[in-house]
């Protein structure tokens, strides 16, 4: 088994830490997988963040639908990307050609490590 530093550091991220961070994203705002990874001290762990969000046991109460791709596209969601988009639109997020409009304006800064 290959134990490179990226794999070891990704495995140090706890699901509960990710879920706690999600609770800091208010309705009508979004963050990215990379933003969460940076806020947790590992900017290389975006994919690990995605895997953790995919296992979210309570995706409405712990709002993983508020996490989008770094290019502003919706990204994956347990109940489908169309459902994720619907939830975001209900919170006031709009889209232009499949990308969050005013992305910089609605993107939350979760840490000073960005």
How would you describe each model-predicted region?
Residues 2-114:
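Nucleic acid-binding interface residues in structured DNA/RNA-binding domains
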């Amino acid at each position: 088994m290959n134990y490179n530093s990226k794999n070891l550091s990704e495995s140090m991220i706890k699901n509960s830490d990710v879920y706690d961070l999600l609770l800091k994203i208010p309705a009508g705002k979004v963050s990215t997988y990379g933003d969460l990874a940076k806020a947790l001290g590992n900017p290389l762990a975006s994919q690990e963040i995605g895997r953790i969000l995919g296992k979210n046991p309570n995706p409405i109460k712990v709002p993983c639908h508020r996490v989008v791709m770094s290019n502003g596209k919706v990204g994956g969601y347990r109940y489908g990307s169309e459902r994720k988009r619907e939830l975001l639109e209900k919170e006031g997020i709009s889209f232009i050609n499949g990308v969050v409009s005013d992305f910089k304006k609605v993107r939350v800064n979760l840490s000073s490590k960005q």
